[in-house]
A protein has these predicted regions:
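Nucleotide-sugar donor-binding/catalytic module of glycosyltransferases
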Residues: 1-127
Length: 127
C-alpha cells in the first residue's frame, strides 16, 4: 500500500450518553490510525453533548463536532449533513481523497475494524 487511505468516521448521536463513551473509546483504540471522527448531535437532552465536548477537547486532532443547534432532524438527514461537511472540509483536515464510514452511537468497533475494512476496499478496487 503506497499511501494509507484517509478515513472519516461519521457519527450521528441522539440521547446516547449511556453508550457514547464506550463507542468513542472503541474508535480511539483502532489499529488503523489515519482517520478522524466527525460527530453531529441531533438535539440530545441528556449528557451526550457534554460527552462529545469532552472528547473533542481531549482529542483535538482526531475528533471534531458540528456545532450544537438543538434541532432534531433524524438520523438520515443528520448523516447527510455529516457527509456534506466531510466533503466540503476534507482539505482543512489535511485530506485529499476520503473514504467515509458511518457509525451508530451504540456500536462498539473491534480494534481492527478499520484496518480490515480498508484492506478489503483496496482489494476490491484492484479487481
Amino acid at each position: 500500500m503506497k499511501s494509507r487511505p484517509e478515513i472519516v468516521i461519521l457519527l450521528s448521536t441522539y440521547n446516547g450518553d449511556k453508550y457514547l463513551v464506550e463507542q468513542l473509546e472503541s474508535l480511539l483504540r483502532q489499529s488503523y490510525s489515519n482517520f478522524i471522527i466527525i460527530i453531529r448531535d441531533d438535539g440530545s437532552s441528556d449528557e451526550t453533548q457534554k460527552i462529545i465536548t469532552d472528547y473533542v477537547t481531549r482529542n483535538r486532532n482526531k475528533i471534531y463536532s458540528l456545532p450544537f443547534d438543538q434541532s432534531n432532524i433524524g438520523p438520515s438527514a443528520s448523516f447527510c449533513l455529516l457527509m456534506q461537511y466531510a466533503l466540503e472540509e476534507k482539505e482543512s483536515f489535511g485530506f485529499s481523497r476520503i473514504y467515509m464510514m458511518l457509525c451508530d452511537q451504540d456500536d462498539i468497533w473491534m480494534e481492527r475494524k478499520i484496518e480490515i475494512q480498508v484492506s478489503e476496499m483496496l482489494s476490491a478496487e484492484q479487481e
